[in-house]
Amino acid sequence: MAFQVNAHVGNRTASSHGVVERIMTDSDRRAFGLDGDNLFRAVERFRGRWPTGAWVRSPAIAGGVDLYQAYAHQGWRQVVTRLEPISSTIHHPNTDRTTVVTARLSNNSSFPGEFFANLSNETTNSATTSWSSTHGIEVGQSVSYSIGVVSGETSFGYSYQWGRGGEQTTASSVSFVTGVTVHLQPGQGVIVRLLAEQGWARITTRYRASLTGHVAQNFNPPHQGHHFWAHSVNSILQASGLPTQIFIENTVDVGFFANSHVDMQDLVTGVIVPIGTDKIFRPLALKYDEIKEDDEKFADEKEQQKGEHKKETKH
């Protein structure tokens, strides 16, 4: 199965799961130091004698039979490589407030009015992954990352081929779209800003490769009265001072945007007011009744001016 890493930057929590088990491959043999004559040398150090043949998997042909099949009833098992994540950790999470897009609204008329600001922009979430360069373990599996940002935000995800050398960078688009209506008095102006948290974090996942099973051996002439032997692969590794486990580290650096909100700044007073997007907003720090009074007074004055203008026209 593929590997899955779940990380929540806001909570600083991370977990990982998945496992791959397969018959030991040639690349695994190289990684554990059992390729070519190294396998024979390891058996020699364990048994004190160079074997005629040594195998970690079928076909292990000796005496006209496959030793793993012929002695399966005695518990002889091909060597299996097991790869699994054992820990995931979030390092150095950090966020800064940044302005995504702005809009300037001005009322250049002689009447109060409502002005609409459409705020939209597109940016990217990104992830760059790198691997331990010397592990030598090859697995045809992907690693999927689900990265949560802050509470209530939808997580974003990436998928990489496991263990691919060098760095891989992936980016996904993030769209910010909102609209707000602002009530402005004559001559008044504001800057409406769409802001978001821009964040960074590093996610480190540690994997472990281990082996189980037996190394099948053939000795001719017989060794201690027997041609065929099988011993735990880990016993043979330990006798040769070779590792019984290999640890691989994967590092992912993520950059993200989240937790957007809108505010506005009065062009004259410089006052910044946080706002939503479902109401009509008045940037001045006045009570609604006071603004309503001003609007009604202004409307009455306009009506009075119209009436006086009509009288002058009749004369």
Curated annotation (Swiss-Prot):
Compositionally skewed regions (Basic and acidic residues) per UniProt: 299-315
Main function: Structural protein.
Cited Gene3D superfamilies: Proaerolysin, chain A, domain 3
Superkingdom of origin organism: Eukaryota
Name used for this protein in its record: Spherulin-2A
Region called Disordered, residue ranges: 295-315
Organism of this sequence: Physarum polycephalum
